[in-house]
Amino acid sequence: MFENTNPDVMLKMKKYGYLAFWAIMVPLVPFSAFVGVESGTQDYWAWFMYAFIFGIIPVLDYLVGKDPTNPSEDVQVPTMSEEVFYRVSAIAMGFVWIAVLFYAGHIFMNNGYGLLGKIGWIVSIGTVGGIIAINLGHELIHKDPKVENWMGGLLLSSVTYAGFKVEHVRGHHVHVSTPDDASSSRYNQSLYNFLPKAFVHNFINAWSLEKKYLERKGKKNISVHNELIWWYSISALFAATFGLLWGWQGVVFFLGQSFFAALALEIINYIEHYGLHRRVNDKGRFERVTPAHSWNSNFLLTNLALFQLQRHSDHHAYAKRRYQVLRHYEESPQLPAGYATMYVLALIPPLWRKVMNPRVEAYYEGELDQLFRDGKRVNNIA
């Protein structure tokens, strides 16, 4: 639909498109709560956001189509990178999420949900949190200004996943697409094999990386200098606040939405690097990270929803680049659809392998020794 749009027009549309998307999406949260109560079917409407994100968005994403537009490196990138509007937009959306979270806690306790409805509301809000809190948190923790970096930490704390702030930057970005990275899924590895390892490793590794960092600085691990202690303390404060407002069920809601937000993140991690590995050079070392080591997706609608996270190839090659100037690389491995669609496919391993394994094999054509399966090199596809 927009593939032949004038690049300057497209960039202007996208500038306001990120907020416009969420100006439509966020009101759907109270809408689903209201319609559920008015119709007397609140237990079913509690699942609306989850169903909309992974049922309707994939269809709309396909219909809207792709966005090949890249800003010009010499003129537009320097200007756009410094525009305050983009920074304020990201931070403002962070505060919107905090408001949504507390509103959702109120609805959880006062909308007359049965067990089915309570589970559905937790899943729906957790999924929204995975998109807003963790996605924006991810964008902001890569930035140097303290206001942005701290906001990223606050957003991750709001879904009890602060370890991501440390492990992602100091662990994942260093070891991405190697067997040392638990957030890089292996060729033929199922999502359900990937998830437990990712959750456990990333939590433990975050504390290990912070400890090593503090040791290099000559500071004690268990001290006020350990940022993970601060961020997890903020998570505890969130939980305590929900407990004071709504009792033990408020705590259950907060921890439940946190789990599903983190789950959404790790499923996206599974998608982003599936089967891709940095080649081993003649010296036995992994090559440097390039746009070839992440799957790229250029579907416009989901890129607006995710602040261009799907241009993941450029993000890993140049981690400090701001979301508005991330580039599409046609030569990077390309996903056949946006993340919302790929999320659904990942839940069904046979279907996922049918779609993705041929793409991985094509990428490594003539280099099967570079493929890994279960931590071992693959010598043949069979």
Swiss-Prot record:
Belongs to the fatty acid desaturase type 1 family. AlkB subfamily. This is Alkane 1-monooxygenase 2. Its cofactor is Fe(3+). It comes from Alcanivorax borkumensis (strain ATCC 700651 / DSM 11573 / NCIMB 13689 / SK2). Induction: Induced by n-alkanes. Keywords: Cell inner membrane, Cell membrane, Iron, Membrane, Metal-binding, Monooxygenase, Oxidoreductase, Transmembrane, Transmembrane helix. InterPro entries: AlkB/XylM, FA_desaturase_dom. It is found in: Cell inner membrane. One of its GO terms (biological process) is alkane catabolic process. Fe cation 2 binds at residues 173, 312, 315-316. The keyword Nucleus does not apply. CDD domains: Alkane-hydroxylase.
